[in-house]
Amino acid sequence: MTNLTLMNQLTPKQIVEKLDQYIIGQTGAKKSVAVALRNRYRRQLMDESIRDEIIPKNILMIGPTGVGKTEIARRIAKIVRAPFSKVEATKFTEVGYVGRDVESMVRDLVEVSVRLVKEEKMQLVRVKAEKNAEKRLIKLLAPSQKKKQTTSQNPLEALFGGMNQPDESAEEEVDQELKNKRSQIEWRLQNGELDDEIVTVEVKEQQNPMLDMMRGAGMDQMNGMQDALSGMFPAKKKKRKVTVREAKKILFEDEASKLIDADELAAEGIHRAEQMGMIFIDEIDKIASKEGGGNAQVSREGVQRDILPIVEGSQISTKYGTVNTEYILFIAAGAFHMSKPSDLIPELQGRFPIRIELDKLTQEDFYKILTEPDNALIKQYKALLKTEGIDLIFTKEAVERIAEIAFQVNQDSDNIGARRLHTILEKLLEDLLFEAPEINMESIKVTENYVNEKLAPIMQNKDLTQFIL
């Protein structure tokens, strides 16, 4: 099912309901993102004459850390299988300085988009690819006795992976005895009897040695040259010993890739990134200019001016082709403790017309976060200990006390939102997680007294609270 079909089936109200399964509160932010997503679907149904005039309304989320800014964007992208990329504004530097090139955010998005399209296309060719992979695997488990013709390699060919590789698909002479043997192996293979056997397969190396030498830390400008060189020289292959179970996956991916048109994959990946892509720019408040900032202010403003043309709409070169960023949805987020949105350059402010202020989390929100979402933290810890045969039970009073402590610690020290629950639960269950394999108990109940016993000493010492919780 394509992401356009998914959006067709989901109204803004339904999108918010799906987000409610994972994120507590923040209704305003959920509504704004849901409407932005639905507008993209509406745009696809319009005539071309007006469609090109409608661009996404970018969103600026304002709120402290840990209240759900990133999670809202990430979850909504998963719901509709839209290409999604998260970047941190502080990682970028002005052109001419060492650091990530701002255009890399678009390249990252295209990589995600192509991967999503490839996954969908691999499902379409799954049956044929699995059949071809099985044939190759049977030949590896029961090889022909006929010796393969060896080919000489000069040193350069050896370095770049070899130009003259034997053709695995070449016809081979198979006698009746070998046919019978392969028939038996096929039956055992399909029944999973050989999954733990070891077989040698050829796999492509991830990087060419020469490209590894040329790669520099943070040098995104080298991507184009690396991609060009990787296309000139074939990927070097190496032999690996793996289980039959793993070999099935390796050979399936190889066979599926052969059945997928690379040009069509690149074109569709670029189209989806352009029309459905979402880029989340976190910590944008950290590059906001402030009064009297000196050289640091100039540098931050330079990054903003580098980001501006991408948000406005420009042509970015990637290894798959040129990408137009005009219709990509940008969601920027920041706490804005030390600065305010008006500290951003006016041109960039104007490109984020929808502004949402997210609410700080209350004690009641913490309780709901612990219990209601499908991926609630308490459910995660219960599942972890279930693997040890222990049924972990939390009383209502215990959960309320955990929520109260999390809220109080956030009030007394830095407010890190829902992330505080991770540190508190980890400290609370530390001994239990350590001793679980040796505990001969079917169930353990976490009560309010247990919570107080484990956390009260730390709560009473403000210095310990600051460093431990």
From Swiss-Prot:
UniProt-annotated location(s): Cytoplasm
Pfam families cross-referenced by the UniProt entry: AAA, AAA_2, ClpB_D2-small
NCBIfam families to which the protein is assigned, alphabetical: hslU, PRK05201.1
Any one GO biological process: protein unfolding
Family designation: Belongs to the ClpX chaperone family. HslU subfamily.
Taxonomic superkingdom: Bacteria
Cellular component annotations (GO), alphabetically ordered: HslUV protease complex
Coiled-coil ranges from the UniProt annotation: none
Function: ATPase subunit of a proteasome-like degradation complex; this subunit has chaperone activity. The binding of ATP and its subsequent hydrolysis by HslU are essential for unfolding of protein substrates subsequently hydrolyzed by HslV. HslU recognizes the N-terminal part of its protein substrates and unfolds these before they are guided to HslV for hydrolysis.
Designated name of the protein: ATP-dependent protease ATPase subunit HslU
Keyword annotations: ATP-binding, Chaperone, Cytoplasm, Nucleotide-binding, Stress response
Subunit comment: A double ring-shaped homohexamer of HslV is capped on each side by a ring-shaped HslU homohexamer. The assembly of the HslU/HslV complex is dependent on binding of ATP.
Gene3D superfamilies (alphabetical): 1.10.8.60, P-loop containing nucleotide triphosphate hydrolases
PANTHER family registered for this protein in UniProt: ATP-DEPENDENT CLP PROTEASE ATP-BINDING SUBUNIT CLPX-LIKE, MITOCHONDRIAL-RELATED (PTHR48102), ATP-DEPENDENT PROTEASE ATPASE SUBUNIT HSLU (PTHR48102:SF3)
